[in-house]
Amino acid sequence: MNIRTILPKDKFDVESVEKLAKRSNDELREILPELMEWLQDGNWPISKPVENLLLRFGVELIPYIQYVFQTRDPQWEYFMLSGLIPRLPLECLRMLKPDLERIIECPTDSEILEELDDVIVPMLNQL
């Protein structure tokens, strides 16, 4: 079965996330970018279940998180910073330090409006 056929169809499709949770990490690796997209809004019903699923990957998520920071989408960045990232091992936070420092030192106007520094400073203080 093609794993992409199980991807959530909409923000309410918790059933698909439950099916994906039964799959191996090897199977899920190919759809990590698509799964990350479901973290664009932490208010979506499937956001937290997808986040729980992604936690299985730990350090492997770093390039995908860095991609989110490169999009300069402050809402998506916010939900990464307030949801997924604090739940990852401290090692991941260390790996993301340059990205977090960039947001603090050279934020975009929208990152300033989203007040991402309020979330980032306590994280950096853990290091």
Predicted feature descriptions by range:
Residues R4-T5, D10-N25, E37, P45-F57, ...:
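Structural detector for internal amphipathic alpha-helices that build alpha-solenoid repeat scaffolds
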Residues G42-N43, R72-D73, T108-L113:
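Short inter-helical turns and helix N-cap capping residues of alpha-solenoid HEAT/ARM repeat scaffolds
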Residues M1-R4, D26-W38, V59-F69, L90-I104:
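Amphipathic alpha-helical scaffolding segments comprising HEAT/armadillo-like alpha-solenoid repeats
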Residues R23, T71, I103-C106, Q126:
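Surface-exposed polar/charged interaction patches
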